Amino acid sequence: MIRIILVLLFIFKISASYSHSQLSEILPKDNVTYVKVPSQINMKFNSLVKLVKIIMIRVDKKEKINLDLTSLNDRAKEHTLPMPKLSSGKYRIEWRALSPDGHIIKGKSDFEVK
């Protein structure tokens, strides 16, 4: 009986760990150097998420870059923002999102503009 309970708990733990939302794609891509900057910031997730924070930093000058957040959806699998005009330099996008199960997920993408 205890073995059955342990097996069920193990299966439940595995299925719960796979249910969290994940970022499946981000543009600009992490660790990429661009000669031509993408026209937008695009984030794709495997489930509906609410983007609760997104910032862009020019890493080499320690400057925060203003982003136009008006196009953000409340909950969506894909979030798109217009890309601000960027000069040559190293940049980072940091983001946080709320998944349907209430967990906060976060990440970053570092890229360079030549």
Regions found by a protein language model. Give the residues of each.
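Positively charged n-region of N-terminal signal peptides that target proteins for export
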Residues: 1-6
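Acidic, low-complexity Ser/Thr/Gly/Pro-rich repeat segments typical of extracellular/periplasmic
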Residues: 34-36, 42-112
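N-terminal edge beta-strand
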Residues: 18-37
